[in-house]
């Protein structure tokens, strides 16, 4: 063999010579006598020649590809070390993603038409304040970390190239999502600025007679531009902002405001209190100053028990006494609603809660107020069921049974034990009706089970099937809870009977595919929450004394009920009575007030 000739030759030449000498080796080994007996046809000779030639070509190609692979492995680490200190660019970009997220949530941009007070996530009000990040993109971060002198001028293009080369993994998808949200928030800022500039231009562009006399050319130019076009552009821009806010609500944390209520009041021309007008004026003035938000935050954080950095807007003797009770730990509470009701701190919420409890206790001592609150609850739920095209007959029967049970003095002790087992700290109207029943129901609707969402989001199922499945799920849950009751025929059992009629309607309204019913339920929830927020606002109600607070709460309740019942198309609860006068014995009656 000719394997000895490989010294001083390349591997390819040695392999070619070896393959070429195979026929000679076979001929010399087996002798000419063996090959002389073979009779090869011309076709067989061609096949053998083609096979030998293909084998040689395949061996050469495999060897050449193997050499190229080795060169790539050697060049890869050298290129990575020359660019960013032996750290590949995709890794740096992946490490920068968390910082971008922090930047997105570090600032807030306030809408020029509303304020951010509310923290409910289920209300379909327009979100005025959005988390907006820095105006710099990820490409600027790459430029900062680059040591090349030309990186500053070509950073954005290099970043785009690197983004295209990054494989579509979970990390890159997350970074692309963050970049998209960042750009979307920047677009929101630009649209908000355009809207505010347009509003300022409309407000200050009205020409006066003096201006027209002094500058007739400019006056004619201002009048030449059609006013309708500017208004149409402003309306389109505002509609675009509203749609963008709703889109951002679906993919991020929301901070809904009470702008829906203010717009409704402006449309219906309902009277506003002096406190709400003053708050609105303060909000409009604060839009021109970015420092006002931070200064207000510092003032709120500095509020402590027994210390008042700034004097209150009005005297609040009852509130100050309640703060002392909170300091002593004598105000129990089941759930803190500090953020939901817009309170400055937990101590502020507890002090106002104590005053509200006392105010409701005084209100419910009068027969007329008992009739009013009982009838408002009946008419609100009846209006909701009517809007949902459901018969309220079953609800009215269960509601009457629950009221008759709650008004019997012999049931109050059992009711107290049942509610204390559920964590209710005080037997008051606020703790039982507003907090335990309404607020807990809204919280449950904000976090529905995944199985329910899967059914409601299935596009292949009809709306009637979804509604039936949701109602069946609600009934099965209530039936299972009824089996675990401590008192089989107590207050909670009667409440479950009412919930069997109301829960499916509310659940399908908040979670279902019908936009009209969803709007009605969202408005209902928004009105209830705003009613509680106004009740816990020192500027809307008087905390000077318990009777004054009770009077303001009653007026606030009448005003909110008129708005809500008017929207639902239900009659206002003014002169319709309950099932008879309440007993006025001392002791047990106070437990339910």
Curated annotation (Swiss-Prot):
Alphabetical list of InterPro entries matching this protein: Miga (IPR019392)
Keyword terms, alphabetized: Membrane, Mitochondrion, Mitochondrion outer membrane, Phosphoprotein, Transmembrane, Transmembrane helix
Pfam families: Miga
Gene, per the UniProt record: Miga2
Subunit relationships: Homodimer and heterodimer; forms heterodimers with MIGA1. Interacts with PLD6/MitoPLD. Interacts (via phosphorylated FFAT motif) with MOSPD2.
Regions of compositional bias (Low complexity) in chain numbering: 106-116, 124-134
Residue numbers of Phosphothreonine PTMs: 206, 273
GO cellular component, one term: mitochondrial outer membrane
Protein name: Mitoguardin 2
Compositional bias per record (Polar residues), positions renumbered to this chain: 205-218
Record membrane topology: Multi-pass membrane protein
Disruption of the gene: reported phenotype: Mitochondrial fragmentation: mitochondria become round and show loss of cristae. Female mice show decreased quality of oocytes. Mice lacking both Miga1 and Miga2 show strongly reduced quality of oocytes and are subfertile.
Gene Ontology biological process: bone development; mitochondrial fusion
Motif FFAT location, chain numbering: 292-298
Cytoplasm in keyword set: no
Region (Disordered): 98-134, 150-171, 197-229
Family label: Belongs to the mitoguardin family.
Subcellular location: Mitochondrion outer membrane
Superkingdom, natural source: Eukaryota
Organism: Mus musculus (Mouse)
GO molecular function: protein heterodimerization activity; protein homodimerization activity
Transmembrane parts of this sequence: 11-31, 42-62
PTM comment: Phosphorylation at Ser-295 of the FFAT motif activates interaction with MOSPD2.
């Amino acid at each position: 063999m000719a394997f000895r000739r490989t010294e001083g030759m390349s591997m390819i030449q040695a392999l070619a010579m070896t393959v070429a000498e195979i026929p000679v080796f076979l001929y010399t080994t087996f002798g000419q006598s063996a090959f002389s007996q073979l009779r090869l046809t011309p076709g067989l000779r061609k096949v053998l020649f083609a096979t030998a030639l293909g084998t040689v070509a395949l061996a050469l190609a495999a060897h050449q590809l193997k050499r190229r692979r080795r060169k790539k492995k050697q060049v890869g680490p050298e290129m990575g070390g020359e660019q960013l200190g032996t750290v590949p660019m995709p890794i740096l970009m992946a490490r920068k993603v968390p910082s971008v997220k922090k930047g997105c949530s570090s600032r807030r941009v306030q809408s020029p038409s509303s304020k951010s007070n509310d923290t409910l996530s289920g209300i379909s009000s327009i979100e005025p304040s959005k988390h907006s990040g820095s105006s710099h993109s990820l490409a600027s971060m790459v430029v900062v970390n680059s040591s090349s002198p030309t990186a500053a001028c070509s950073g954005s293009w290099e970043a785009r190239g690197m983004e295209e080369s990054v494989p579509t993994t979970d990390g890159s998808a997350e970074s692309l999502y963050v970049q998209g949200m960042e750009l979307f928030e920047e677009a929101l800022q630009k649209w908000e600025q355009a809207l505010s500039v347009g509003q300022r231009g409309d407000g200050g562009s009205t020409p006066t007679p003096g201006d027209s006399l002094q500058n007739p050319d400019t006056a004619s130019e201002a009048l030449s531009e059609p006013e309708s076009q500017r208004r149409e552009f402003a309306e389109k821009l505002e509609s675009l902002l509203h749609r963008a806010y709703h889109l951002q609500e679906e993919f991020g944390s929301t901070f809904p405001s009470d702008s829906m209520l203010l717009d409704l009041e402006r449309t219906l021309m309902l009277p506003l209190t002096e406190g709400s007008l003053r708050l609105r004026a303060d909000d409009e003035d604060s839009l021109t100053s970015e420092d006002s938000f931070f200064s207000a935050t510092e003032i709120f954080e500095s509020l402590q028990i027994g210390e008042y950095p700034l004097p209150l807007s009005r005297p609040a003797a009852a509130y100050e006494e309640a703060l002392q009770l909170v300091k002593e730990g004598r105000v129990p509470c089941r759930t803190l609603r500090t953020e939901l009701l817009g309170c400055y701190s937990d101590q502020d919420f507890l002090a106002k809660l104590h005053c509200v409890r006392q105010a409701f206790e005084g209100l419910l001592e009068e027969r007329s107020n008992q009739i009013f609150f009982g009838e408002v609850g009946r008419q609100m739920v009846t209006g909701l069921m009517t809007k949902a095209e459901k018969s309220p007959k079953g609800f009215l029967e269960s509601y009457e049974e629950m009221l008759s049970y709650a008004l019997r003095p012999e049931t109050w002790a059992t009711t107290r034990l049942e509610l204390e087992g559920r964590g209710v700290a005080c037997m008051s109207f606020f703790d039982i009706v507003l907090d335990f029943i309404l607020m807990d129901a809204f919280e449950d609707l904000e976090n529905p089970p995944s199985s329910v969402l899967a059914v409601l989001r299935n596009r292949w199922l009809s709306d009637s099937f979804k509604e039936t499945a949701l109602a069946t799920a609600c009934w099965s849950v209530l039936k299972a809870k009824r089996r675990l009751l401590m008192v089989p025929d107590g207050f909670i059992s009667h409440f479950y009977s009412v919930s069997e009629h109301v829960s499916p309607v509310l659940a399908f309204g908040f979670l279902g595919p019908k936009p009209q019913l969803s709007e009605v339920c969202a408005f209902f929830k928004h009105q209830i929450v705003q009613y509680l927020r106004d009740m816990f606002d020192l500027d809307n109600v008087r905390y000077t004394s318990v009777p004054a607070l009770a009077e303001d709460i009653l007026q606030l309740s009448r005003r909110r009920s008129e708005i809500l019942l008017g929207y639902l198309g239900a009659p206002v609860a003014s002169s319709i009575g309950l099932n008879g006068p309440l007993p006025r014995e001392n002791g047990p009656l106070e437990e339910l007030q």
